[in-house]
């Protein structure tokens, strides 16, 4: 009899669709190492589509993620990379081996969207608890935020030039 009650107690919220909903996570991430680690995690977990907006001055990241991008490309993941107009021709050539690349002038900030279920938005620099200036970003797996980020990326992409 207690088993029946347990089963009913567990299944009734599902049946009534009133169960406790899981809260999406939204994190403020500070520091280059922490941001790079989370970006690498997003890239490594990507299965279908990876969208990257590479901000001004972030060309050194390309060398770090190049091997992972190649692996994803070989697995059939669609990769699109938006770069700022001051990005070197060598960097654009390197990225274009594994991804479709477009150049956008006046691009501010950057980010990474993996499979429309995770996003990292680079906000610029902020001050940590000690008062030191560090890069700051927002990471989320919130469907609304990831959807908005993809829409915005698509808007920038449509206005960018192919190289």
PLM regions and their residue ranges:
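A short, Trp-centered hydrophobic/proline-enriched beta-strand micro-motif
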Residues: 48-54, 79-81
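Secondary-structure "cap/kink" motif recognition
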Residues: 40-49
């Amino acid at each position: 009899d207690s088993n029946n009650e347990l089963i009913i107690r567990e299944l009734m919220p599902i049946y009534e669709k009133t169960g406790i909903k899981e809260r999406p996570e939204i994190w403020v991430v500070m520091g280059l190492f922490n941001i790079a680690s989370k970006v690498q995690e997003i890239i490594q977990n990507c299965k279908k589509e990876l969208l990257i907006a590479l901000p001004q001055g972030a060309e050194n990241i390309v060398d770090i993620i190049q091997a992972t991008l190649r692996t994803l490309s070989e697995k059939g993941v669609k990769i699109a990379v938006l770069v700022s107009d001051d990005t070197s021709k060598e960097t654009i050539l390197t990225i274009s081996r594994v991804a479709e690349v477009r150049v956008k002038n006046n691009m501010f900030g950057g980010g990474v969207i993996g499979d429309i279920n995770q996003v990292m938005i680079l906000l610029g620099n902020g001050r940590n608890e000690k008062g030191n200036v560090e890069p700051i970003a927002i990471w989320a797996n919130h469907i609304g935020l990831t959807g908005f980020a993809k829409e915005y990326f698509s808007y920038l992409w449509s206005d960018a030039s192919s190289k």
